[in-house]
C-alpha cells in the first residue's frame, strides 16, 4: 500500500512540474491598464503562434529566427489576427475564442499580433502612426516565411479596426500577393477620405473583404474591398446601447460586433446571406434579392466561406452588400420577400407587423423602417427578416397600423399577399382577399401560391 502511494506521489509531482513548465512556456497577450494608456506606451510587437498541437498555448516567435524551436509549419495556411486601438490597455476579450474557432475550423498556423504596447495610448494619433511600423514588422516575418517556402496566397490576415489598415499596409508591401485580407469594421478616424496608399484597398491582397458595423462613429464608411458587408446598414447594431448611460458599451458595442459576427461564421453556427444593393433602404424594400451575376453560386454568404465567391467578386467592381442580424448568436435571420396588392379606392400609408406560427412556436417582425404605400392594384414589396425559422408555417397573423396623424380609422383591403422564402426552396405562401382593420390582428392559414407570379 505504501509503495502505491509513493508511486502516485511521484507521478503527481511530475505532472505538476510539467504543468508549471508548460505554463512558463505558454505566452499570453500583453495586459496593460488605463494608467499605461495615460502615460503612453512605446511600440513593441510580439508574435504569438497557436497550432492544433496545443491550441491554448501561445508560443512567442523570435523576430530573428521565427521557425526555430517552434511548431510553425510554413507549408500550412497561416492566419494573422491583428487587434486595433486599446485605450484601456486590456487584451481583447474575444481573442482566445477566435483562435479556438480558427483552429477548430482547419489545421493552420494562427499568429496573434500583440502590439498592445503601442496600441495602448490616449493619443490616438500616435497609435495611428504606429500602424505603419507594425506592418513593417509583419512584412519582415512574411518575407522570412516566403524565403522558407511559404506561399503568399496561403496567408490570411484578419484585422480589427486599425488592424485592418495594418493588414492593408502589409499586403501592399507584397504588391497585393497576400491571399486574403478580412477587415472587421476598419477604423474610420484618420483614414476616412485618405487615398488608397494610406489605407486598406482592394489591391492589397488577392481577395479583400470588409465588414462595417459602426460607420457613423469608429468605423470606415465607404467601400474598401472586393466585397463590403454593411451589417444592419453598417451602424447601430441590434442589442447595443443607444445612450451614453450604458457606459463603455455605448462606445464599443457596435464596433466590436464585427468581430463576433465574423467569429460566428468561422464557427459555422448559421449562414448569413449578403445581398448586393446600392442602399440599405433598397435592401429593406426587398428590391435587391437578385444575385444572378453570381450564377449558380447564388448570393454570397458572409464571413469565412465568402472565399467561394472570390473569383467572381474580383472581376466585378467593388460590391456593396447588406444583411440584417439578431442581437445575439445565432445572428442569422430568416428572410421572406413580401409582395402585397391592395384594392382600396384611395391610397393608404402605414406599417405592417407579420407573425409566423407553426402551431407551437412563433416569430414576429415589425416592418417599420418607413411608411409603406398601398395603391390600388399596385404591388408593394418589402423584405421581412425573422429571428428564427418556423417550419412548417401553419398560421400567419397580420396587423396594419396607419401612419400617425391620419384619421378616421383605416381599413386595408388586400387582393392578395405573397411570402417568398429566401433561404430555402420552399414554395411561396399566399392568401387572397383579406380585410385588415386598423391595429387589429388578422390570423389566417396560408396556402401554396397558385403560380410563380401574381
From Swiss-Prot:
Biological processes per GO annotation: lipid catabolic process
Top-rank EC class of the record's enzyme: hydrolase
Catalysed reaction equations from the record: 1-hexadecanoyl-2-(9Z-octadecenoyl)-sn-glycero-3-phosphate + H2O = 2-(9Z-octadecenoyl)-sn-glycero-3-phosphate + hexadecanoate + H(+)
Pfam family, one: Lipase
Gene3D superfamilies linked: alpha/beta hydrolase
Enzyme Commission code: 3.1.1.-
Family listed: Belongs to the AB hydrolase superfamily. Lipase family.
Functional summary from the UniProt entry: Hydrolyzes specifically phosphatidic acid (PA) to produce 2-acyl lysophosphatidic acid (LPA; a potent bioactive lipid mediator) and fatty acid. Does not hydrolyze other phospholipids, like phosphatidylserine (PS), phosphatidylcholine (PC) and phosphatidylethanolamine (PE) or triacylglycerol (TG).
Protein name: Lipase member H
Gene: liph
Amino acid at each position: 500500500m505504501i509503495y502505491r502511494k509513493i508511486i502516485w506521489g511521484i507521478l503527481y509531482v511530475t505532472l505538476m512540474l510539467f504543468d508549471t513548465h508548460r505554463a512558463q512556456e505558454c505566452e499570453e497577450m500583453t495586459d496593460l491598464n488605463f494608467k499605461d494608456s495615460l502615460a503612453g506606451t512605446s511600440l513593441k510587437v510580439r508574435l504569438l503562434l497557436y497550432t492544433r498541437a496545443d491550441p491554448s498555448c501561445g508560443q512567442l516567435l523570435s523576430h530573428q529566427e521565427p521557425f526555430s524551436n517552434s511548431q510553425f509549419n510554413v507549408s500550412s495556411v497561416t492566419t494573422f489576427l491583428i487587434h486595433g486601438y486599446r485605450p484601456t490597455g486590456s487584451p481583447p476579450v474575444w481573442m482566445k475564442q477566435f483562435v479556438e474557432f480558427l483552429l477548430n475550423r482547419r489545421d493552420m498556423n494562427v499568429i496573434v499580433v500583440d502590439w498592445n504596447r503601442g496600441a495602448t495610448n490616449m493619443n490616438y494619433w500616435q497609435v495611428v502612426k504606429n500602424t505603419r511600423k507594425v506592418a513593417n514588422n509583419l512584412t519582415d516575418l512574411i518575407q522570412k516565411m516566403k524565403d522558407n517556402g511559404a506561399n503568399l496566397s496561403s496567408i490570411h490576415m484578419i484585422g480589427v479596426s486599425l488592424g485592418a489598415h495594418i493588414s492593408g499596409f502589409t499586403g501592399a508591401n507584397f504588391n497585393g500577393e497576400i491571399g486574403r485580407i478580412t477587415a472587421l469594421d476598419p477604423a474610420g478616424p484618420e483614414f476616412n477620405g485618405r487615398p488608397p496608399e494610406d489605407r486598406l484597398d482592394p489591391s492589397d491582397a488577392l481577395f479583400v473583404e470588409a465588414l462595417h458595423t459602426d460607420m457613423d462613429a469608429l468605423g470606415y464608411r465607404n467601400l474598401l474591398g472586393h466585397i463590403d458587408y454593411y451589417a444592419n446598414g453598417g451602424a447601430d447594431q441590434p442589442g447595443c446601447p443607444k445612450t451614453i448611460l450604458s457606459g463603455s458599451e455605448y462606445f464599443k458595442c457596435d464596433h466590436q460586433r464585427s468581430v463576433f459576427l465574423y467569429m460566428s461564421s468561422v464557427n459555422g453556427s448559421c449562414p448569413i446571406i449578403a445581398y448586393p444593393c446600392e442602399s440599405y433602404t433598397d435592401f429593406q424594400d426587398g428590391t435587391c434579392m437578385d444575385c444572378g451575376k453570381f450564377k449558380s453560386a447564388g448570393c454570397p454568404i458572409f464571413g469565412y466561406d465568402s472565399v467561394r465567391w472570390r473569383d467572381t467578386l474580383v472581376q466585378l467592381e467593388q460590391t456593396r452588400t447588406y444583411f440584417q442580424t439578431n442581437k445575439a448568436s445565432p445572428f442569422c435571420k430568416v428572410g421572406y420577400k413580401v409582395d402585397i396588392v391592395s384594392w382600396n379606392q384611395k391610397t393608404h400609408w402605414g406599417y405592417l407587423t407579420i407573425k409566423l406560427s407553426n402551431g407551437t412556436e412563433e416569430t414576429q417582425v415589425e416592418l417599420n423602417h418607413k411608411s409603406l404605400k398601398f395603391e390600388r392594384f399596385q404591388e408593394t414589396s418589402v423584405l421581412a427578416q425573422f429571428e428564427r425559422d418556423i417550419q412548417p408555417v401553419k398560421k400567419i397573423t397580420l396587423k396594419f397600423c396607419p401612419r400617425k396623424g391620419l384619421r378616421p380609422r383605416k381599413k386595408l383591403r388586400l387582393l392578395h399577399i405573397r411570402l417568398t422564402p429566401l433561404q430555402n426552396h420552399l414554395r411561396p405562401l399566399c392568401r387572397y382577399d383579406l380585410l385588415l382593420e386598423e391595429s387589429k390582428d388578422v390570423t389566417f392559414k396560408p396556402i401554396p401560391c397558385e403560380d410563380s407570379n401574381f
